[in-house]
Amino acid sequence: MSSTSTRVFKVGIGRFVQQDFNQKAYVRAMRLALLHQYTRLAGLRVSMKEHHGPFFKNYTFFIRHQWAMLNEDIISDMIPQPIHGLYSVTYLGSSSILCKSQIILEKQQKCISTCIAQAVCVSLQNRKPVSFPVAIKEIYSYAALGARPQIAPLLATPEPTQQQIGIQKAFIGETDVDENGHTNNTAYLQFCSDVARKAATDKMFTYVTPDILDSRLKKYTIHYIGETVQGDEVTFTSWQDLQNEYLLHFEAKKDDRVIIRCQFGF
């Protein structure tokens, strides 16, 4: 599929403000994750038009895979800074779409973060994947022309001899869930950040320090395997990969069931 066949939708966001930056003057990864989520949801609303309401009465999207790149060079002298999001669907399958969102600095016209997400159409009744309604297929028909994208295999965890471990339990709270009662994608990223920071502060890792967590996160990848709801207790485990000091691995489990696997790259 040529790039000219992709329809791009602009989404108004607002500004970066001081609270969006950490002590090292880098944009917080969680802030960018929230902006990508907002851009994706707003992009769906704009692109679906009058079909948006009827669709979400019977269906919703489950994010199966998410990859984001963050530009670490954005510093505090750029705030206050107007920003907007760009949203596009780059591939349409029978029950999933590949969404691309970008966060753009309006003054410099510079993309500071790109996110690719595989969104699966699921029934609201049982959360099982279903085929898109005909109306939705027609909206994104232009995205069905390309070759099926290669989705990365499920993230693996390091072997015991290749890792250092930090473990932390968390309860899913009221502010962590969406309107359907399921945990927001960005909440998992925050929990991973929290367990990494505690492990780094407790000097569980050889290489990754709290200072690095504040300044050098360049990308993250998340594979969503299961779901949680308010009140669930989830165990988050983080590993520093001793064979690749620039990677942190994460796994979240409810009882013995894997919910997510995630990587932070520095």
Tell what function each PLM region has.
Residues 1-82, 196, 200, 204-213, ...:
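Hydrophobic, proline/glycine-rich low-complexity stretches
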Residues 59, 109, 160-162, 214, ...:
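A generic structural signal for short, solvent-exposed coil/turn residues
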Residues 1-40, 117-118, 122-127, 132-135, ...:
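Catalytic strand-loop segment that frames the active site of acyl-thioester-processing enzymes
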Residues 170-263:
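Acidic/His-leaning functional-site neighborhoods
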Residues 50-58, 62, 87-89, 217, ...:
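A structural signal for short, hydrophobic beta-strand segments that form beta-sheets
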Residues 2-13, 67-82, 86-155, 224-235, ...:
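HotDog/MaoC-like acyl-thioester-processing domains
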